[in-house]
Amino acid sequence: GALTPVITPLQAAPARDSRRLQLEHLHTEEQLSLVYAIGNNYLPSATQLLDRFLRDHYSQEIGRIDLRLFDLLHQIQQILGCQQPFQVISGFRSPATNDQLRANGTGGVARNSLHMSGRAIDIRLAEIPLTDLRDAAMLLKAGGVGYYSQEQFVHIDTGKVRYW
């Protein structure tokens, strides 16, 4: 089969209060597993890798991802007691890509999408029911949660608390 690119930063053994994320991108087939924060400190080298990993997979444009989005993902994994990687459908989206997806009639693409400001991500977990993922995100009351059962993903963002 095809080789899957893996990005792995060199790191010391993780501290007790470290926060880790494991992601696999369904479009680029890249995988990433790293500690992105220790205590109140975000690790710039790790957040830069996350920004690149969650780039617009159509244009390759890299946006700056809201650090709170990483924490939401980490908290969801804690709630679900799950160690498996999040499967990423969409992270950052350039305005041009967003307009193109809207023009193509792709469902659920908002004109002022928070994907364009690095404040939204569309994800799923292979072994976890989509409804459980949605419920865990809603439990946090930390932003928007969209449930797309047909498309098999949950949208999570750091905007106003709202559900659809």
Residue map of PLM features:
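N-terminal export signals
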Residues: G1-Q11
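Cleaved targeting-peptide boundary
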Residues: Q11-S18
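Catalytic cores and adjacent binding grooves of peptidoglycan-active enzymes
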Residues: R19-E24, G105-W164
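Structured segments of extracytoplasmic/periplasmic soluble domains
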Residues: L26, V35, F53-D56, L72-Q83, ...
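Active-site acidic/histidine clusters and adjacent loop/turn architecture
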Residues: V35-I89
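Acidic helix-start/capping segments at beta-turn-to-alpha-helix junctions
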Residues: P85-D99
